[in-house]
């Protein structure tokens, strides 16, 4: 991925995680962690974070991952990078729009956050490299 795409991806992930720190009613484990590290003041903007910022930042992370596909052409990396934001979006929308049980929505959201975090660490440790050219992959010459 290009440096800009990687930075945008990290901004989306950090924004989603920090946004989850603000909602004690929705995501008690994340809010407890946020309060423990001094981010308890975010709870006064709980509605803004849950309704707008978490979905926006998760969408930014998803779009950055999908944009990275055009740089590295690795479907496995793109799939793994997309799972976390999609789970986070399903969890937060399931909770705010009441189409999922609260506990199930929380589990899905937390799973999405963990996947986003782990894939982000993996991306920093092992950055993506282009495997194919934009016009297609070269096939190796046949062995004789």
Curated annotation (Swiss-Prot):
Domain of life: Bacteria
Side of membrane Cytoplasmic, spans: 1-21, 68-78, 125-144
UniProt-annotated location(s): Cell inner membrane
Record annotation: effect of changing residue 23 to S: Loss of activity
Cellular component terms per the entry's GO annotation: plasma membrane
GO-annotated molecular function: mercury ion transmembrane transporter activity; metal ion binding
Entry keyword annotation includes Transport: yes
Residues annotated to bind Hg(2+): 23, 26
Cited InterPro entries: Mercury-R_MerC (IPR004891)
Biological function: Involved in mercuric ion uptake.
Subunit structure: Monomer.
Protein's recorded name: Mercuric transport protein MerC
Organism: Acidithiobacillus ferrooxidans (Thiobacillus ferrooxidans)
